[in-house]
Structure formats: C-alpha cells, structure tokens
Amino acid sequence: MMENLLIPPPPWTGRMDGTSSHHLRWHQAVTPLQDGVEPGACVFIGFSSDEGVERNKGRRGASRGPDALRSALSSMALAEPLRAYDAGTVAVTDNRLEAGQEALGAVVAATLDAGQFPVVLGGGHEVAFGTYLGLAQASVRTPGKRIGILNLDAHFDLRSDPVPSSGTPFRQILEREHAAGTTLQYSVLGISQPSNTTALFDTARGYDVRYLLDDECSVSDRHRVAVFVSEFLSDVDLVYLTIDLDVLPAAVAPGVSAPAAYGVPAETIQFVCDAIAASGKLAVVDVAELNPSFDIDNRTARTAARFIHRIVTKRIPIVR
C-alpha cells in the first residue's frame, strides 16, 4: 500500500491592497484543494526533499524550497482572476525518497485526471522522477501520445548511481520507458560543459538527448533557442517542463546547491517558459533545487516565482 506522505498546505499570506479584482494578488486567489473542483484550474503541489541532493553529495536545504516559493509568489499581483488551489506538500522523511516520489506521482496523476494543471514546487531535482510518474500514470497519456521532457538545467542528471538521487532522475525515466517498450523525447537547455563529464555527454548521446550548452543560450542567441524549442515542440504532444534553478547565473540564483559560474540569462529562460506555456501542449511543470539557506535577498525564490507566475497566467484560463 502506498504511504500517504501528503501534509496540508500552509496558509498563503501577503500584502493586501483591497479585495476587488483590481487589487488581486496570488495569496488572495489560492485556496486549499477540495474534492469536486471543476477542471481548468492550477494546482500547486509541494515536494519537500533533501534526500536526493544529499545522496548526490550536494548541500542540504532544498526541503524548504516549496514554502519559500509559495512565499515569493504570494504577493505577486495577478492581472486577471484565475482559479488556483494548493494540494499540500509531499514530505520526504527518514530517507524514504522512493516512497515520496511514488506519493508525488499519485498526486500529480490525480490532478491531471481531474483536468487540472499541476505545478510542482521542489525540493531537489529528484522531484523529476515523481512528476514523471504522475504524467506516465495519468489518463492524458494515451497510446500514441508523444511525451517530451524539456529540462532547463546546467546538468544532464543522467548519472548511473547505485541509488536514486538528484543526479539520476532522467536516466531512471529513460530506463523505465525502455523497459515498458515506450519512448519519450528528453531535451536539455543550458548544459554547462565543465559541470558534466565526458561520460555523461556519452550517455546523453546514447539516449539521443538533444541539448544546448549554456554559452549557446545568450540573449543574442534568441533565434538558435527559438529553433531548438520549436523543433522540440513539433516532435511531441504532451510536455513536461522542469526548471532546475541552477541553470541561472549565480548572481541571479545564488540559492541552489550548485551555483552556476556562467549560466543562462533569465531573459532566455523566460522566453522558453513563455513559448512552452503558450504551445497548448504543457501538461505539468516543476521547479527544483531552490535552497533558501543560501538565497541572498530571496533572489532565487523571487526569480523562480516570476517564472511560475508567467507560466501559469499563460496556461490557465482567466475567470470572467
């Protein structure tokens, strides 16, 4: 029997300028998820985990990421009303990462089956395997539907470690697909060559992973990035977008386990998020690796919240 690791959502609080739609902020729009919610809403799902990062020899602290993201998003202004809910947080304790990933998968699948848009707040990048499990189990994945994962990340996360970690999720996913006789397209934007060994590049080639290096994603490279995203979208029917915040420069995102010496500009990441959200193919998104312990002036959380805000407001219909 699957463990119930879901804890209730915290209250969303923030600045209050008024109660009309002209004064609306996120904390006024988000309510706890209830049974019987109509399709078409955004549902936030937290994934509180340090276990995968620790197994990958990283810095602990990502377990506090979900609440930091909620806090950063709370006071952002909404231009139009929309329906948004919080399902709570899957909390990984006592080294039970695999149980946590299964529990997250169950929540994501239920959210998709209810016709909602899941937004998963990590947590280390081990969150990715749980998010994928949800998409793989959901009814939206019908035979013949082509699945694509676009990872905005400095790392391939294709390690072959003996135990699952934040460095292994996409190898786990690709191996699971192969065992099931199915396939998906895995693409990565923002790869840092010095942060990935030759063995990892060889693994990526073996799995036919498409990627752009971080130094190919500057603002002046907009056309190259646009072509990369367009080709990705043309080959898939359903998209899982995953944002590892260490893809950003350290000055923008200091609050991660492995800050980037170079990184991809926020302008490029926002451009990609906008394109994916507007494609009509985005099924689920997650944000990973926020570590509030190292987040100077909440820079990383605020930047991540901006991306979430853009994605959701482009993906979810407004309420008239």
Swiss-Prot record:
Pfam short name (any one): Arginase
Cofactor note: Binds 2 manganese ions per subunit.
Residues noted as binding Mn(2+) 2 in the record, renumbered to the chain: D153, H155, D244, D246
Sequence positions that bind Mn(2+) 1: H125, D153, D157, D244
Entry annotated with the keyword Acyltransferase: no
Keywords: Histidine metabolism, Hydrolase, Manganese, Metal-binding
Cofactor(s) the protein requires to work: Mn(2+)
Enzyme Commission number: 3.5.3.8
Annotated InterPro entries: HutG (IPR005923), Ureohydrolase (IPR006035), Ureohydrolase_dom_sf (IPR023696), Ureohydrolase_Mn_BS (IPR020855)
One term of GO molecular function: manganese ion binding
Domain of life of the organism encoding this protein: Bacteria
GO BP: any one term: L-histidine catabolic process to glutamate and formate
Pathway(s) of this molecule: Amino-acid degradation; L-histidine degradation into L-glutamate; L-glutamate from N-formimidoyl-L-glutamate (hydrolase route): step 1/1
Regions annotated as coiled coil: none
Catalytic activity: N-formimidoyl-L-glutamate + H2O = formamide + L-glutamate
PROSITE patterns on file: ARGINASE_1, ARGINASE_2
Similarity section: Belongs to the arginase family.
Cross-referenced HAMAP family: Formimidoylglutam
Physiological role: Catalyzes the conversion of N-formimidoyl-L-glutamate to L-glutamate and formamide.
Protein name: Formimidoylglutamase
Organism: Rhodococcus opacus (strain B4)
Name of the encoding gene: hutG
